[in-house]
Structure formats: C-alpha cells, structure tokens
Amino acid sequence: MSKQPVSNVRAIQANINIPMGAFRPGAGQPPRRKECTPEIEEGAPPTSDEEKKPIPGAKKLPGPAVNLSEIQNIKSELKYVPKAEQ
C-alpha cells in the first residue's frame, strides 16, 4: 500500500469559485440576443390579416370585458391593516 497524505484541501479549493445558486435550474449565462432578426417598428400595429381574423361564432360585445363597477366596489372594501406588533 502506498502512503499518500489524505487531504481534502484540493477538493475544497476546487469548489470555492462556484457562485451561490449555480446548480439551480436556469442558472448560467443568459441566452444571447439574436442579432440577425429583422427590426420591426414597435409603434406600428401588425398589418397582417391572419392576426386580426375574428373567431367564428364570436360576437363583439359593447364595453369592456370586465365589469368595472364590481372591481371598484371590491377596491373600496379593501382596508389597510397595520402589522401587529409581536
């Protein structure tokens, strides 16, 4: 049997530079931006007819899709509750 000194120093030193959370999913370098994508004006609405096709059988309803008075009533019922001292 060869006698080699038992040392964990190298194993510990090898792991010093690993940042916290490095092994979590999604850790690492962010995805690179694709520079070859065509530039699209952000202010211009889409002009293709495919995106504006109405759904068959759908009806256009007047007003917003949400009842605003219900939201306002619930909002008025909310109160600020201070944190209880322990």
From Swiss-Prot:
Protein name: Small muscular protein
InterPro entries: Chisel (IPR029268)
One GO CC term, this protein: M band
A Pfam family per the record: Chisel
Lineage: Eukaryota, Metazoa, Chordata, Craniata, Vertebrata
Family according to the record: Belongs to the SMPX family.
Region ranges (Disordered): 20-64
Gene encoding the protein: SMPX
PANTHER family: SMALL MUSCULAR PROTEIN
Superkingdom as given in the UniProt entry: Eukaryota
Function: Plays a role in the regulatory network through which muscle cells coordinate their structural and functional states during growth, adaptation, and repair.
